[in-house]
Amino acid sequence: MRFDHTNRLWLATTHGLIFRDNGQWHVYSTTNSNLPTNYIYSIDFDSQNNVWCGTFGAGLTCFNGTSFTTYTTKQGLESDFVATVCVDKNDVVWFNCRSSQYPEIYGLGLSSLHNGQFKTYTANNSQLASNTIWDIETDAKNNLWLATGDDKGVTQFDGTHWNIYNTDNSGLALNEATHIALDEYNRRIWFTCYTGGGVTYANLQYDNSAVTTLNASKELTIRNNHVLLDLPANVSVFDTTGHLILSDYGTNIDLSNLHRGIYIVHTSNTNYRAARIIIP
């Protein structure tokens, strides 16, 4: 799910490319367009508001508002299974191709498309930590941030230098980061880390592309409508409209009085900030 430069909502789905405009939903599929497949992994937008889509088995495709232009292994892709897609501030399209045999788990490196030319960085020809990349994001300085597989943590790439952050050299909660989100207002990068029982959230604050703090919540558990924490923390619960529903402090916060619905739980103390979506 992404918003384009005109604030229209776009969805990557298994039923095609969907967007919402002026209160109306629109669907592009193989039946009403030249979209190569209905299985869309991810989407992002270039400076011209073209939509770039990674697909499951049909390559990388670009929608200019009228038609789709598709790139496959015939044009130079490592594979036609293209997972996460990210367009940087120079309109370089970055993406991770996946193994055609095991596309859900095996990646083929960090690839880019710029001015019609493909380039791929791998763990063999560069300092890329893992060929499997779960997510890609760019920061305000146009650095790439990669959530890498194989327990390799998070990688920052400025086009020349690679910086790797893991549990040994930072406060990253776990080494298997799965998703990345950019908070431009607060100059923070947020990561989710796979825990086997859900996700934990870490935030990274950067200044001039240098890491100044990296603090993570390693113990945020929600069980039987209670927030359980390893250390006392401020806990705030918001509904989906952003209204504060509950505020408390401690290590065991009772949520049993919440009505059924979707809520966002924020926890924070001097050591970490964390968030979790819950449905009590």
Model feature map: region roles:
Residues 1-210:
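Carboxylate-rich, polar loop motifs that coordinate divalent cations or form catalytic acidic clusters
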